[in-house]
């Protein structure tokens, strides 16, 4: 953990760190056209952190868990700022902005106060907002570092009871701290199991970008059936690593993304002339839940 706001000021603007505080540092973010004509909003630092936390983490999360998530959110945004700024410097781009406003435009989703008021029950708004804001303020300046840089801190809603290894999912040893860990409480999550039914034609259309070799030939004319779907391997946490669709081999994550499934931990069941997909967990399964 380090004193964060001073460091980010140097990374982003090169201003005197002693003159920058959380209260006068602003982030430029993507905003809806309803809120800002040019689609860009300038949001006070802690307000943005609060909005990202509210977007990602359920309001009924226990206080200490919410504080842990607040540290992850702050680290995530700090990492995004650092990487974006370094990319600009590499391209010799110079900022023409002055003061404590980031020149980088972030696209990490957040809830504005207006969106919170629109989405939350009126009698819950103040209580929820203060809970998120308090978590941000209680962990002020706290971020996670790994090897002298901001750590990658992925978050997901729930998993199969085991979190996933970044090395298995990404095929890279860059994040050795994202490991397989038991998470027994996730098995009790209300969103633990999902059931989705698709026609074979729907799957063929949704997965066309990686089934291209089969979309114009005999298989396209004949269509798929249940026997064309086979799970070939799982990773250490029980998520689908590879599966076969007809003659195509794809990853579980490719399949999840194509069908907008909540998780790549899934199984198949025949359902008349359709296929039923049963999922476990919600999200990519890496990091904290």
Question: Each predicted region: which residue ranges?
Answer:
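Conserved, single-site charged/polar hotspot
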Residues: 1-288
